[in-house]
Each structure stands twice: as structure tokens, then as C-alpha cells.
Amino acid sequence: MSLTTHDRYAIRDLYARYSWARSTADIDSFAALFTQEAVIEDEGHRFDGPGAATDYLRAWLSRPGAAGQQYWIMQQVLDGDSTGCEARSFLMTPMLNPIGTPSMTFYRFGHLSDRLVKREGTWLLSEHRIDQWRGEVLEGFPRRDIAMVSAGGTP
């Protein structure tokens, strides 16, 4: 059976809770969104197994500037059924300007590639991959040089 409207709403609610928990350093609420055997990959850093979500968020929170960042997840593409699905999402991470003015800059433009499972009626993240907006997502473009260079890569 394909994803129901209720499933889609519950998954979008999970991502809203994820964004809020991550942006407010709520480690317990963040960890509650993942399975015990979760795998999290963020640009080459891998966390897996029990405690993966807690370990990942603690590592991320220790980065300079983390306290001024918000985590925006939007426009999910969901494919699956009532027991599991794959999700692809756009990601933006604005942060307060470090010079103290009431302005912001963007720390990250990227995308998420996730696998979710439904356990006892609750959707949870079992695989969570965070990447910059470069590489394979741009392979369909004949000219990627500008995007690659601006994202810190090579054309």
C-alpha cells in the first residue's frame, strides 16, 4: 500500500520536529526521531548504531557558530509504502552573522537522502545522509562549473 495522506503528514511533522530539535540543541527530542540502529552520514562523517543521533548532534553542536544556526528542511519527495519510505529534501542552514549585526548568512545549501521506517505507528529515521548541493545532484547539467566552484569543489 502506498503512503497515505496521514503518513505524509506524519513524515513532514517528523522533519519539523527534527529542524526544531536540531536548531534548539534539544538532544533528547532529536534522538527520539531515529531508530536505535540508525546510520547518519554528514559529508564524510559517519555515526551508526545505538547513540548515533545523540553522538552526531553533540558533535555538530560543538562546531563554532552552531548556536546561531537554524536548520531548514523543505520540499520532500517521498517514495514508499505504509511501512517504509525514501525521502529526498532540500536543505538550507542560515546562521546569524558572526559580526553581531541583525543579519544572516547561509552556512549550507544542500540536500538530504533519507530512509524512514514506521515502527509501532511512528515514523523514524533509519538512514540520514546530508550532502552539499554538488556532485551527483548536478550531473544532469551540461555546465556545472559555476555551481561546483561556488560550493567549494572543482568543476
Feature locations, PLM:
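Short, low-complexity N-terminal intrinsically disordered segments enriched in polar/charged residues
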Residues: 1-36
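Short, surface-exposed coil-to-beta transition loops
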Residues: 71-73, 107-112
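Short beta-strand edge/turn micro-motifs at domain boundaries
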Residues: 86, 109-142
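Acidic/histidine-enriched, glycine/proline-rich intrinsically disordered or flexible terminal extensions
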Residues: 136-155
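A solvent-exposed, acidic/Ser-Thr-rich amphipathic alpha-helical stretch
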Residues: 27-93
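Short helix-capping and inter-helix turn/linker motifs at the boundaries of alpha-helical repeat units
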Residues: 5-9, 66, 103
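Hydrophobic/basic alpha-helical segments enriched in Actinobacteria
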Residues: 29, 81, 118-122, 143-146
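Short, cysteine-centered beta-strand-loop-beta hairpins and adjacent loop/turn segments enriched
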Residues: 94-105, 136-137
